[in-house]
């Protein structure tokens, strides 16, 4: 499932993050690449664990913790600290798949990358190109979202970023280990939760159907969760 999550950051929060990022020193994006990705990747990136990356990343993690749609769709167990990249002057990222396990340098913290996330930090009209293209059995899905919006998709997907030919595309990217490993199971739970929320709004939380469906949701989560 590929999902657009609007308004993860407010415009004010985006501006605060950009103030941090625009004052930072950027390095070659291949610092975090695997062997396959290094052959396809050309961009700039904030050094992992740098003060700027930590400050902006903390703001994003705080926002994610308050976002009900993110929790419903991802069922997060672990979130890799957000990283940041910048594409300009023809930079692009060819077709690749993300590494299955992400290690936080200098620690024993590791994340199984069930889901990948890109949080856009530049308005789409300010640059040409830079579309995130995610492939699945139904074709290629493209994302170029307003600043503050995020796209969530299975980390097992082939994906690429088209060349940026004008302006600069600035974004955060990170990975999530879900409590529910299987994408189909996780999608089913998300769809069920969405309908429970809709039914609750119509009938109230004490309705017998709402109570029954909520029980089914939690029993499925109990069956499938790794937590």
Swiss-Prot record:
Q: Which residues form the Fe2OG dioxygenase domain?
A: 78-178
Q: Which SUPFAM superfamilies match?
A: Clavaminate synthase-like (SSF51197)
Look up the EC number in the record and give it: 1.14.11.-
Q: Where does 2-oxoglutarate bind?
A: 169
One GO BP:
DNA damage response
Q: Which residues bind Fe cation?
A: 96, 98, 159
A single GO molecular function term of this UniProt record: L-ascorbic acid binding
Q: Which cofactor does it need?
A: Fe(2+); L-ascorbate
Record's keyword terms, sorted: Dioxygenase, Iron, Metal-binding, Oxidoreductase, Vitamin C
The free-text cofactor remark is: Binds 1 Fe(2+) ion per subunit.
Q: Which PANTHER family match?
A: PKHD-TYPE HYDROXYLASE YBIX
Q: What is this protein called?
A: PKHD-type hydroxylase BURPS668_A1690
Please give the organism. Answer: Burkholderia pseudomallei (strain 668)
Give the organism's phylogenetic lineage: Bacteria, Pseudomonadati, Pseudomonadota, Betaproteobacteria, Burkholderiales
């Amino acid at each position: 499932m590929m999902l657009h999550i609007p308004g993860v950051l407010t415009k004010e929060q985006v501006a605060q993050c950009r103030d941090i990022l625009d004052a930072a020193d950027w390095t070659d994006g291949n610092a975090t690449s695997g062997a396959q990705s290094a052959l396809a990747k050309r961009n700039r990136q904030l050094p992992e664990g740098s003060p700027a990356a930590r400050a902006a990343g903390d703001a994003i993690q705080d926002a994610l913790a308050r976002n009900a749609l993110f929790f419903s769709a991802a069922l997060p167990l672990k979130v890799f600290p957000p990283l940041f990249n910048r594409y300009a002057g023809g930079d692009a990222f060819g077709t690749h798949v993300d590494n299955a396990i992400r290690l936080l340098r200098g620690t024993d913290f590791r994340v199984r990358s069930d889901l990948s996330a890109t949080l856009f930090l530049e308005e789409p009209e300010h640059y040409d190109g830079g579309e995130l293209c995610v492939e699945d059995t139904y074709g290629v899905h493209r994302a170029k979202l307003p600043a503050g919006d995020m796209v969530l998709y299975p980390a097992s997907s082939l994906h690429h970023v088209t060349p940026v030919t004008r302006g600069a595309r600035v974004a955060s990217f990170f990975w999530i280990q879900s409590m529910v490993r299987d994408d189909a199971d996780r999608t089913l739970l998300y769809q069920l939760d969405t309908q429970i929320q809709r039914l609750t709004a119509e009938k109230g939380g004490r309705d017998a159907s709402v109570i029954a469906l909520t029980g089914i949701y939690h029993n499925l989560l109990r069956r499938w969760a790794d937590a």
